[in-house]
Amino acid sequence: MGQRQKLHKQLELALGSKRVYYQPPPSVKLEYPCIIYSKTDRELLRANDSVYKSFDRYQVVVLYTDPDFEATDHVLLLPWATYNRHYAVNNVYHDVLYVYSD
């Protein structure tokens, strides 16, 4: 199983449902709560003029309508997960996180 697919499964477990989308097209009708994620960067660790390790960075957005929803806390338990920001649009809460995967 690839690293992205492994992350996908971990996000499904954190959310408690299958509503996890990797770069969904605009035609997908979202149902809340859900998670949308996409690859945003690749970190390269270098030594002796060569790359010895690389990590993909994914932006993970947890969307929900219940202000007490706890999936964000579950995602933050993943290794190398960091919280970035929170905002609300049309009574839908958005928590933006970054998760690194090797």
Where do the protein language model's features map onto the residues?
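Short coil/turn motifs at beta-sheet boundaries
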Residues: L30, V51-F55, N90-V92
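Acidic-leaning, charged glycine-interspersed low-complexity segments
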Residues: H74-D102
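General N-terminal targeting signals
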Residues: Y37-K39, Y52-S54, L77-P79
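Short, conserved charged micro-motifs
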Residues: P67-H74
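Small/polar-rich, solvent-exposed N-terminal microdomains that initiate assembly or binding
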Residues: M1-L44, S50
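A broad, low-specificity signal marking well-ordered, structured residues that form hydrophobic/aromatic
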Residues: C34-I35, Y58, A81, L97
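Glycine-rich loops and low-complexity Gly/Arg-rich segments
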Residues: L45-N48, Q59-Y64, Y83-A88
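Oligomerization/assembly interface segments of phage tail-like spikes and tubes
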Residues: S54-D66, Y93-D102
